[in-house]
Regions:
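Acidic/histidine-rich, surface-exposed loop or edge segments in extracytoplasmic proteins
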Residues: 52-66, 124-132
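Pan-zinc metallopeptidase signature
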Residues: 251-360
Length: 360
């Protein structure tokens, strides 16, 4: 699997063996006890190892005459983005110093599931990351097969692509071609995703996906705007702000549907009436938001995972006053701070962190 490139020294092969061993140990520890079996372990290890094998230094990609100008320009910003993040408390890592050009539109495809008449999401538990409400697959066909297995159990299933993910500092994550979008929001999108994934490598609480994603969303939103503003990239700043207005509108509408459906599920009407009313509510949501497919309970649960607690983080930041004190407060939070796995609300946790770390 490890093929030495022309002109590279023999230490590359030794380093390859070391990285391969780390991949195996990480994936084995994280996934081997999972209920999805050895096939999930195999694809996870192979997928991660493939990325590490294909990664090349960003400087080399920039110098390569075959690298498109658009990609070259975006890659040249990565070092500056990383340095900017560390100024505001993100942990310096060796991630995003290499580049991988993928031959697919997404790096992984993510599956999640929920009961059809209750917002009760399926969870998978692993030693390193705790419980998680979704699984990622490097091969789209594998993801589809797993989604069909979940559907056969009578569950609502969501299958979506992801342009990036973080190994939480276990590996040096590369910049992926899937992280380099087209259009006027290309640079702002790259700034956002590098900062977002860097937050995960800075703070990660096992078993608390909504907390982790909401924290990353809050921090990356603030810092991405500050980065663009401080670098005089006003057109990109306007683009990202416009995009977030629309994103917030869609998220609010998703939340409204969640609240309406949750009340329906908890009511005493018959199962048949619940299913009929659910179909009506979701059909309206699809039409209003212009979705390509009808959403379901798993879709709405995933929507709640990202950015659903921004007000709590904003209140904590205002109380702490500086990024240094904000991160000090965040680092007082661990798995024991929550009442159980996958808490959907944690304003009390954030308030307690402020009490401990940001006293007047």
């Amino acid at each position: 699997m490890w093929k030495r490139r022309r002109g590279e020294g023999s230490d590359r092969g030794a380093r390859g063996v070391s990285i391969a061993a780390r991949v195996f140990l990480f994936v084995a520890a994280a996934f081997v006890v999972g209920c999805t079996g050895p096939m999930y372990l195999l694809q996870a290890g192979e997928g991660q190892l493939d990325l590490l094998c294909r990664a090349r230094p960003i400087e080399r990609a920039i110098r390569d005459p075959e690298t498109p100008d658009r990609v070259r320009k975006l890659l040249s910003e990565v070092k500056s983005i990383k340095a900017f993040g560390t100024k505001f408390g993100l942990t310096p890592t060796s991630s995003y110093e290499t580049y991988v050009a993928l031959d697919r539109p997404r790096v992984v495809w993510v599956t999640s599931a929920s009961d059809p008449l209750a917002f009760k999401g399926r969870k998978w538990r692993f030693p390193i990351v705790g419980s998680v409400p979704y699984l990622g697959w490097f091969d789209r066909d594998d993801a589809r097969r797993f989604a069909e297995e979940l559907k056969a159990e009578g569950l609502d299933v969501e299958l979506r692509g992801a342009s990036a993910y973080s190994t939480l500092g276990w590996f040096s994550d590369p910049v992926l071609s899937t992280m380099l979008p087209d259009g006027p929001q290309a640079l702002s999108g790259l700034v956002d995703v590098v900062l977002h994934e860097s937050v995960h490598a800075t703070v990660y609480v096992a078993g608390q996906s909504t907390f982790n994603e909401s924290l990353a969303e809050y921090v990356s939103n603030r810092l991405a705007e500050e980065y663009l503003r401080s670098h005089g990239l006003l057109a990109e700043l306007a683009a990202i702000q416009t995009g977030r207005v629309e994103s917030d509108r869609r998220r609010r509408r998703m939340h409204e549907a969640y609240v309406e459906l949750n009340a329906l599920y908890e009511s005493s009407v018959t199962k048949e009436k619940k299913l009929a009313e659910k179909a009506r509510i979701l059909a309206e949501l699809k039409k209003e938001l212009g979705l390509s497919r009808t959403p379901n309970n798993a879709t709405l649960l995933q929507s709640k995972t990202y950015g659903s607690q921004d007000q709590g983080f904003e209140a904590l930041f205002e109380r702490c006053g500086t990024w240094e004190r904000f991160w000090k407060a965040i680092r007082t939070i661990d798995a024991g701070s929550f009442g159980g796995d996958q808490a959907s609300k944690f304003s009390g946790v954030l308030a307690a962190a402020g009490d401990e770390a940001c006293k007047p």
